[in-house]
Structure formats: C-alpha cells, structure tokens
UniProtKB/Swiss-Prot annotation:
Enzyme class, broadest EC rank: isomerase
Alphabetical list of Pfam families matching this protein: PGM_PMM_I, PGM_PMM_II, PGM_PMM_III, PGM_PMM_IV
Catalytically driven reaction(s): alpha-D-glucosamine 1-phosphate = D-glucosamine 6-phosphate
UniProt binding sites for Mg(2+): 102, 244, 246, 248
Protein name, entry field: Phosphoglucosamine mutase
Task performed by this protein: Catalyzes the conversion of glucosamine-6-phosphate to glucosamine-1-phosphate.
Required cofactor names: Mg(2+)
Amino acid sequence: MGKKLFGTDGLRGRVNIYPMTPEVALRLGLAAGTYYRRKSHRSRVVIGKDTRISGYIFENALTAGLLASGMDVFLVGPLPTPAVSFLTANMRADFGVVISASHNPFYDNGIKLFDADGFKIPDKAEHKISEMILDQSHTWDYPDPSSVGRAHKIKDALGRYIVYLKNTFPSTLSLEGLRIVLDCANGANYKVAPLALEELGAELIKIGTDPNGLNINHQCGSLFPEYVAKKVIEMRADIGLALDGDADRLIVVDEKGIILNGDQIMALCAQDLMRQNKLPGNILVATVMSNMALEVFMKEKKGALIRSNVGDRYVMEAMRKHGAMFGGEQSGHLIFREYSNTGDGLLAALQILRIMKQYERPLSSLAGLLQLFPQRLINVNVKQKRPIETMPTLLKTIQRIETAFSGRGRVLLRYSGTEPLCRVMVEGESDSKVNTYAEELADIVAKSLAE
C-alpha cells in the first residue's frame, strides 16, 4: 500500500484499483469506527452515497468494518454530500461517511468523512485513520459479540433534508413564476432538488434526473453547463442550475444563456449579505484560484478577500479561523455558514433564487458585478509530482512572467489532490499575454514531468 491515502477530498480513485478496493474500505470502516467509537454511549455513524453502481460495494464493505468495530450504522441511501453533513449533526451521530467521487466519471469512486458537527474531518484525524489502515500488523480492538453494531435504513432522510433546505428560504417568498432549467448530473440530487424546488413553486425543465449507475456526470452536470445554457435559451427560462454528482457544487446560467462561475456568484451573494449586515467584517473567503477581480471588488466594498488552499474543506477552515460567514471556490463550491458547514449546491441555488425574487430583477442584471481578468487554466497530465521549487527552468520562467505583469497579474501552479494533474493558471489584463504565458508554462511542465 502507498503511504498517502487521503487526498484533498478524502479517498478517491478508480474502482477495484487501490485504494478504491473493498479491502481498503473494510479496513477504513474498522479504523474510523475504532477512532470515533465512544465508551460513554452507543456510537453511531451516518452513511450516504451518490448514484454510482460501485456504491453498493463500498457501502457494504464500510458497513461491515463499522459494525465489527461496534458502531451502529444509519444508511440514508443516495443523497447529496451536504445532506450527509446535515444529517450527521441532526441525528447526533459521531461521524458521517459519503461514498462519492463528486464530478468524476462512474468508474471512479471515493470516500470522505465528516465529524459530529458536519465538518470534514481534520488532517490529524485522517492521519490517525490512515495509520491504522496502512499498518497491516495492526491489531483491531474488536468488541464483545454482544456489543457489535446494528445497521438501520433511514427512510425519512430525504424528507428531513428537504425540510431543512426549505427553511433556508423565506416563508414570505415563493418560486412561482420562475422557470428553471435544472441539471442534477444523474447524481445524488436527482430526487431532492426537483422535489424541493417544485414544492417552493418553481416550474422545472429537468436534465440528468434518471440515473442508471453508469451515467453520473456523463455529458451533464456542472462540468457540462453548456447543455443547460442551450436549454435556457430554447425554453426561455429565467435561470439554469447545474449540479455535480454529489451536489456540493453549483454552476449557474443566466436568462441569456451566459455561464457564470463561482467568483461571479460569490460577488453577488457577498454583496447581498453585506446589505443585510450578515457578512462580519465584510470578509469573504475564496481560494488561490479565484479571479483577481473578486479581490478588487471586495476592496471597493471596504471588505477583504482571504485566500485559502484549494478545496472546500480549506475554505471552511479559513472561514472558522477568521470568523467569516461566507466563502467558496471558483469551481462552484459555496458555503453559507449560517446554514451549513460544507458546500451545498442546492442551498446555494436557493440563496440566488431568493435574491432574484427579492430584487425582482433578472439574473443577468444582478450578476454583472465583476469585470473578470482574463484567466487561462491548463490541466497538464503528469506522471510524477515533483516539488515546483526543484525545477529551476520553471521557476525562472515564472519569475520572468511575474516581473512582466508588474503586480497586475498572477501565476499559480498546483498539483491536483485527486488526479494526476498539474494545474497551470495565469491571470492578467491582456488575453494574448495570458494565453502565451500559460501555454509556455504548460509546455515546460509537460516536458519536465512526463516521466
């Protein structure tokens, strides 16, 4: 086994190839159960999953390990990642588990853990659990046969989550009169999102609500918002909403078919929260990938943009550290801390719809707050992940480009925490310069890390 199990968002990989094997899942159940089991009470864990066919494999393997460790297991079935975060706290569980590979294709899967308050578990807990999994000589502290866990299917989990979501939307408003194109990516939100939005009065045009175990994220969802954009124009809809496979991220399309990224939505929501005095210190947390225009926008509003590492768990860590109530990622993870401890695509959609209803204005006129700096992101496939500082040619090129920008541009290189990729991002005021520099850097990265 390799030394590192957990990436930036838990375990993830191709099904039946290490680490995404039944054996690892079983040991993970034993390890997590051992770590979180409490002698003071009957310990319990909530397990949810998305719609991948392989979910059955890992659900059963994890359950076996958890039961053997003495944990009671509450199975909620296919539900969004943020629903499991909510239910873990709501049901007073000791921790929660989500089986999902988010926006990845069906042949991948993953496992991520939440603590008792619905936060993604910290690095320290991941490290301890990893140690137990990787140590093949580890002796498990099995409980007495009379103290092993019991498994329960929770039939009202979906209803509990819908009630919670609807309570984040003002009771004085409804979605009547709004035509919404909704793409659920054939993923975890295929039931919840249509039910919640229709109960609030919306007219829906649905895409990606017929999962078969193999079609999750397949030419649908947040990675393919152009399909939603096309449908918005065709159906003359007011807005398009594209979720990913586990429904923790959201991409929005306005009534003109223009695709809005997370930075533009963060500006809209941050301004709304500032108007309500619900953004303490006017602090917004975003990642190193967010556009410089968002930084400029917050300064103009006498606020501050605090940048974190990539990953909604790191956004939340920065939010907790700085007392921020709102944060997110350019990729569409949005965290409204008043309501949730993790990114929630549908909850974010409800906040945007509320703003549209309250101001009685089309989304295009509300979301045009940012003049985005030209930005180019190139994902380079790599066979190794050498530290950037050990590649002198690359470092010299970065230094030359940053000097040329004179403080009006940025260069960012980072390895994906879940895929064999190096992400090369260049941002500046000139489209042509940004593209030239990005391609130059990507070429150096490709040549340096191809073997």
